[in-house]
Amino acid sequence: MSNDNTSVNEFDFQLVCEYFSSLERQGPGSPEMTSKALSFVESLTEAAHIADIGCGTGGQTMVLAEQTSGVITAIDLFPSFIELFNKKVEVKNLQDRVKGVVGSMDNLPFQNEELDLIWSEGAIYNIGFERGLKEWRRFLKTGGYIAVSEASWFTEERPAEIEDFWMNAYPEIDTISNKIAQMEKAGYVPVATFLFPETCWTELFYVPQMLAQETFLNKYVGNKAAEGLVAYQRYEAQLYAKYKEYYGYAFFIGKKISD
């Protein structure tokens, strides 16, 4: 597939949802990365209220639930993701403090200064890194933390093919240093930043898609939209293999220290 200025957001909503529902993770990441980011967050008690925004089916949320003792409210726009999320919660018997709710990240169901921690892995791009940081800040208590993972450039210059792909897919992609500056501008003190290893993209995201793609295509034989979605995901994986030294995911952890 060539870069024809298509982005995954342009595919059929229900098809995208069904495709990614079959995956443990809906973006690059790992339990180890979630745990590492959480290690920079201090003073979470049983009374803490955590929000996981753009939670998907909850791979990272279950890690948070295992390693914290507070209440977790997880938000996602896709009802089928939340259905799967809440089934995981039931299996783990966490219903007393973890719940998934269908909702939009630009209309969150929280009060000002209600949250001790805002979490968002591979999802803040849906609203935009800068906008999300600014708009979500009011929900955090003073002393609260925000932890988000975000696609970022590793270099100042890139080959045209990968530059064009990301400018179409997510124009707000930027360098690590610029992302940290944006976090500061939004009113946070940067606490930590670290890069994801390649395995978070390959073994834990693209490889699991291979089997899912075959199952998906067998279900939708002759469906051009389904074929196009799979072709796009395969193209994205090929680009990562070719240009991984130029970009990847990074975690950004910040703290709100004043109103």
Language-model regions, residue ranges each:
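A short glycine-rich, Lys/Arg-flanked "PGG" loop and its adjoining helix->strand segment in the class I
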Residues: 131-145
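Conserved alpha-helix/loop element of class I SAM-dependent methyltransferases that forms part
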Residues: 27-46
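Short alpha-helix
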Residues: 172-187
